[in-house]
Design a protein with these regions (language model features):
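Low-complexity, Ser/Thr/Pro/Gly-enriched N-terminal "stalk/linker" regions
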Residues: 1-53, 72, 76
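Helix-terminus loop motifs that line ligand-binding clefts
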Residues: 36, 69-95
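Non-membrane alpha-helical segments in proteins
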Residues: 56-67
Length: 95
């Protein structure tokens, strides 16, 4: 289970929104191996009904808060949508 950073304000609606967002994020973390990941690791999938991360979603999730709330999972997500060849790394799949 992911332990998210604790966040509380004097605004009950903001506190509730944060808790709901973290719960949604946590529900979308699954084990996965693809791209340049060397073994199966937790990643953020594209959402309910998906079984894999998507390139655009991985970037947006990392930018929006994943990089702060779950940095290792966010890094795994980004690595899972990269490929490597003799010229270096490149984005695979959808953009």
């Amino acid at each position: 289970m992911m332990l998210a950073p604790f966040f509380i304000t004097d605004n009950a609606a903001v506190n509730k929104a944060y808790r709901l967002a973290v719960a949604d994020l946590q529900a979308n973390i699954l084990p996965f191996k693809d791209g340049i990941l060397e073994s199966e690791k937790p990643v953020i999938i594209a959402g309910l009904g998906y079984s894999t991360p998507w390139t655009r979603d991985s970037a947006i999730n990392t930018w929006n808060a994943g990089g702060i709330i779950c940095p290792e999972v966010s890094l795994n997500s980004l690595k899972s949508v990269l490929e490597e060849n003799e010229k270096g790394y490149f984005i695979k799949g959808d953009y």
